[in-house]
Amino acid sequence: MKKLATVGSLIVTSTLVFSSMPFQNAHADTTSMNVSNKQSQNVQNHRPYGGVVPQGMTQAQYTELEKALPQLSAGSNMQDYNMKLYDATQNIADKYNVIITTNVGVFKPHAVRDMNGHALPLTKDGNFYQTNVDANGVNHGGSEMVQNKTGHMSQQGHMNQNTHEPTATHATRSYAIIKPSNDESKSKYAFIKSSNEPK
């Protein structure tokens, strides 16, 4: 009788152990899937444009863009990284003669670049993206370019209505020639905001 009870308890115990294994395996699979999804999301966040291929760009061009950029890490300077991202995107637009639409703006082939050769994507309202102006509107050395409604680049100085002289806030404006793309006769002119202008 003792042998029968021992065999019976052994069968019950083994049944319980083996019946809980599929649950443990399923739970382990779910946990590993959650971990891999989080890792995948982190990897996507460190890719250009969040891992989404911009409109107008092929997967091969996106891969080329990724290879042209430094690896983004937690210690990366986002302003420098974004400037490199915009330059690389503009280079793709120039190389393949395509219009690329991203979340920050549009990159058109052979578009205007600033004095330092950095790309200036067009924003949705038709202005050039201001690569050197932070969220507080502070100019961090370089240029700020805008485009007026007629499509000409300018920063128009305001004239004092009584004296027809420029007001003091616009006295520090200067002019610059933007680097031409391929044809020297097609030089682009822009008005550049001086870094010593009042903020």
UniProtKB/Swiss-Prot annotation:
GO terms for cellular component: extracellular region. Residues 1-28 form the signal peptide. It comes from the Bacteria. Induction: Less protein is secreted in a secG or double secG/secY2 mutant (at protein level). Its main location: secreted. Keywords: Secreted, Signal. It is found in: Secreted. This is Uncharacterized protein SAOUHSC_00094. It comes from Staphylococcus aureus (strain NCTC 8325 / PS 47). The lineage of its organism: Bacteria, Bacillati, Bacillota, Bacilli, Bacillales.
